[in-house]
């Protein structure tokens, strides 16, 4: 009986810890419609591959928060990465041709 009680208390403590834990921030890639870093903005932050919208190639920014990324000239992150991000890039406000980005988590 004492073992079950201890297991229950441990379970409750773990649940409380998880409920109070803050989710960590992740790296993200933002792209603007342009011209430059103006107008509509799209943010890509999910792990894995994201296709960059065809209407947001006016400028970009990569915010590094522990996860690296790679940009591809093709949809669906096919082929060889053209650019790799391992640190932040603050608003590069000129057109770019990448069609997809892969965030490594």
From Swiss-Prot:
Disulfide bonds join 37-93, 47-105, 49-77. This is Antimicrobial peptide 1. The lineage of its organism: Eukaryota, Viridiplantae, Streptophyta, Embryophyta, Tracheophyta. It comes from Pinus monticola. It is found in: Secreted; Secreted, Cell wall. Detected at higher levels in needles and twigs from canker-resistant seedlings than in needles from canker-susceptible plants. During summer, detected on cankered, healthy and marginal bark. During winter, detected at lower levels in cankered bark and bark from the canker margin than in healthy bark (at protein level). Gene3D superfamilies: 2.60.20.30. Antimicrobial peptide. The keyword Disulfide bond applies. Keywords: Antimicrobial, Cell wall, Disulfide bond, Plant defense, Secreted, Signal. Induction: By wounding and by methyl jasmonate. GO terms for cellular component: extracellular region. InterPro entries: Antimic/Inh_G_crystallin-like, Antimicrobial_MiAMP1, G_crystallin-like. It holds the Pfam family MiAMP1. GO terms for biological process: defense response; negative regulation of growth.
